[in-house]
């Protein structure tokens, strides 16, 4: 039986495949000091609140492009675990806002440290220049996604 002719793969097809694989890996055990897991959505939400300060459900909906019911569930879980609290709008608006707590900041720092240590283990044989180049490409990739999506992410 004849085999179909091989055509060179588009580079973006490789990117798609590799990002699909990346999404399935967990670099660290992702457990906080108290032994509970900080899931990805909690980490991302805490990161945004830490970077921008208190935000309402409406602001979070706009920032994440998610519906309010999803964010209500996520923020309710963070409230129950004491990682965020609800406060009146500091500038006098009607909507109450979510603010990261000290426990939330610590959980986020612990997660960041665990993730960084995991990446250090993965990239142990990479040169510092390769790690820096990879970080630059990831930032460029993410900022281009944000540009197309219209939702830039605050960076340090």
Can you describe what each PLM-predicted range is?
Residues 1-10, 129-156:
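C-terminal regulatory/oligomerization modules of transcriptional regulators
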Residues 1-40, 156:
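N-terminal leader segment of winged-helix/HTH proteins
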Residues 16-19, 42, 46, 101, ...:
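Generic structural concept
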Residues 19, 42, 64, 75, ...:
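Short amphipathic alpha-helical/adjacent loop interface patches that line ligand
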Residues 24, 47-51, 112, 139:
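Short, locally clustered residues in the helix-turn-helix/winged-helix DNA-binding domain
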Residues 27-70, 75, 81-83, 97, ...:
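N-terminal helix-turn-helix DNA-binding core of bacterial DNA-binding proteins
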Residues 76-136:
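Charged, amphipathic alpha-helical coiled-coil/dimerization segments
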